[in-house]
Amino acid sequence: RELPAKTPAIVTMGKFSAGHAPNIIPQEAVIEGTIRTFDRDVTALILRRIGEITDATARAFRGSASVEELASAPPLKNDEALTEQMARCAEMLFGEKSVYRLREGGMGSEDFASYTYELPCAYLLLGAGTAQEDARYGKPMHNESVVFNENILPRGSALLAYGAMQWLEDRQ
């Protein structure tokens, strides 16, 4: 109800810490989470509303609360032309079936995103193994059991080198 239905936003409160014993009401609780959007203004709105709701809820119970933004990565914005050029390079090196374009982007949080506001960037994901290849592979990136197929790294290096050569050739 805070955002239009077609405005993508993910708010995850993934950590809640309070007290040390199950039978004692703690003096303090700390909730930590993440906000992921495609738009900096939407992120700012969500953070503001979290602060307002937190404050109102605490006051309703005669308490106090504060919201602190500890770190923030902006939404990633790929340069469309550079991203398409790198996708074509990947197709030339590895075949069309090896390339999957995420037209709508993803909701990942990435420090690299800060660079995308300073210069043209293309953020690429390199597949690093599937469960069909090996039962150890195919877990999500932030899973405690994740294992990557490191044999893919030369392909990633080849793509970056080839993409750089193409970029330089286009500018001669």
What are these regions, as identified by a protein language model?
Residues 1-172:
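Metal-dependent amide/peptide-bond hydrolase catalytic core
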